[in-house]
Amino acid sequence: MPTTPATATHSSSNGTAEAIMLELVDENGTTIGTAEKLAAHQAPGQLHRAFSVFLFDEQGRLLLQRRALGKYHSPGVWSNTCCGHPYPGEAPFAAAARRTHEELGLSPSLLAEAGTVRYNHPDPASGLVEQEFNHLFVGLAQTAPKPDPEEVGETAFVTAAELAERHAKAPFSAWFMTVLDAARPAIRELTGPSAGW
């Protein structure tokens, strides 16, 4: 398996390597422990905290990202603006803002909570499982993305109609439609009825 930001270890303040840890949660989203990131995604999967971000431009178009080919999980597929996992004890909102900046080089000019959704999506291609309690966020992107190529292969702003066309032709992450559908009420509130979300 290639070393990517997701599978790499990080140096702690004393110089030793630390594995990336995730918060394990119960069905209500209450923290019950921690697990190493890759282990939490191996079948059958462990329910853990995650976040998904949906950013829109002033025309109501959604910013999509195609995940970098070097990602250990779902490489090369299209997905929402940003998704990831808070570190243990990190607020999902803070993690969402942090990772959006790390992956896309932009800070949302507005970021609002849009609810939560729980799902279990096996990925047949990798054998990994997304078993997540996902915190949803919607917001505005008023600057052009500057993606980190280790994380993001490409970006695109799309209307609802363009998304439907792209989704019919190109591969998307297993979780994409689940998180999009769960976030739609907040997306409609943000973008207005004319955007068609």
Swiss-Prot record:
Matches recorded under InterPro entries: Idi_bact, IsopentenylPP_isomerase_typ1, NUDIX_hydrolase-like_dom_sf, NUDIX_hydrolase_dom
Keywords: Cytoplasm, Isomerase, Isoprene biosynthesis, Magnesium, Manganese, Metal-binding
Reaction catalyzed: isopentenyl diphosphate = dimethylallyl diphosphate
Gene3D superfamilies: Nucleoside Triphosphate Pyrophosphohydrolase (3.90.79.10)
GO biological process: dimethylallyl diphosphate biosynthetic process; isopentenyl diphosphate biosynthetic process
EC number(s) recorded for this UniProt protein: 5.3.3.2
GO MF, any single term: isopentenyl-diphosphate delta-isomerase activity
Main location: cytoplasm
Function noted in UniProt: Catalyzes the 1,3-allylic rearrangement of the homoallylic substrate isopentenyl (IPP) to its highly electrophilic allylic isomer, dimethylallyl diphosphate (DMAPP).
Protein's recorded name: Isopentenyl-diphosphate Delta-isomerase
Protein species of origin: Streptomyces griseus subsp. griseus (strain JCM 4626 / CBS 651.72 / NBRC 13350 / KCC S-0626 / ISP 5235)
Lineage: Bacteria, Bacillati, Actinomycetota, Actinomycetes, Kitasatosporales
